[in-house]
Amino acid sequence: IMKRVLFSMVLLMAVSFAFAQEKNVKEAKSIAGEVKPDFAKAEQLINEALTNPETKDNAATWDVAGYIQKRINEKEMENAYLRKPYDTLKVYNSVLNMYNYYVKCDELAQIPNEKGKIKNKYRSANSKTILAERPNLINGGIQYFNLNKNEDALKYFAAYVDAATLPMMEKENLLEKDTILPQVAYYATLAADRVGDKDAVMKYAQYALKDKENGQFAMQLLTDAYKAKGDTAKWVEKLQEGIVKFPENQYFFANLVDYYSSSNQNDKAMQFADDMLAKDPNNKLYLYVKAYLYHNMKDYEKAIEFYKKTLDIDPAYAEACSNLGLVYLLQAQEYADKAPADINDPNYATAQAEIKKFYEAAKPYYEKARELKPDQKDLWLQGLY
């Protein structure tokens, strides 16, 4: 009998404690809804409920937690509207907290009940609130980004992007309709790179590739992330992808060629160039790649042939002009190394005349490079002075 009494008392205490926590949730919501809310008290009550085993797995608990943050935001914005002092960071922090709480609420509300049914009564209202307040996640991210607090900035930018992939936001089709998402994703990528979070770089760079202005730089960061993690195969794959996606960006091409050259894999580099040319025979970049590879392999005649083909497609390709000039200079040097150095040698004059021809062949290409890019002296200075 004593054991039964003790067991009953334990059950009674557990029920009472659970009831007390549920009461805290209701009280926290009530306080937050007052005209002059005591947010410190409301947050204290809800924070206890968020960690208590009796209430932490209830969707209602997280819904109220989100509601409190929503009310904090509303009160700060009310002060701003009335031109009273208000805390900008509190506005942004409340939006991020609200977002996180509502996301958790939705996850819990999607768990089927004992009958196997899902009754999510929170999704409709909470998704609308997130959608309305989502722009402030950008503002918060910018605020912290400009303060060089990149970990905090990443949280905001990441939340903005992640919102587009949430099941509760599926009907909004944000990945297609949100035109500034790629730009925000780029800043998420940048912040992630600054704190060394390569996994986050990989995650958000994928969305940033569509950003017209910074997509190429997101691709660079993505490529570097694979290299940093030691995934050489994926790194090479992304370099190749970068060449195709952003043909004007020399980073991908230069790194790929450097990798193949340094690892004695010129045949693979040439195969890549040939595969690209098979798909697009008149693509100036692929012709340039092939010329550059021959150039590195010291097959100067082939290099000249493909640099000229490149310039046939685009006469204003300054780098091709510069490299074509350089190949002629290299031929001159190669010829000079074998030519007689003695001025009294009967073949000396003939050899010097041949060397001069190479320099004369190089000059117009260096002049063209200077005309096209006068500020980039490294493209033409060595060939003209």
Placement of each model-derived feature along the sequence:
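Canonical positions in the second alpha-helix
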Residues: 49, 105, 160, 207-208, ...
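Short coil/linker segments at helix-helix boundaries
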Residues: 68-151, 155, 159-182, 330-365
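TPR alpha-solenoid repeat register
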Residues: 61, 169-173, 184, 217-218, ...
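Start-of-domain marker
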Residues: 21-81
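Residue-level recognition of tetratricopeptide repeat
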Residues: 56-58, 167, 181, 214-215, ...
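Structural marker of alpha-solenoid helical repeat scaffolds
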Residues: 52, 108, 163, 211, ...
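Canonical tetratricopeptide repeat
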Residues: 64, 173-174, 180, 187-190, ...
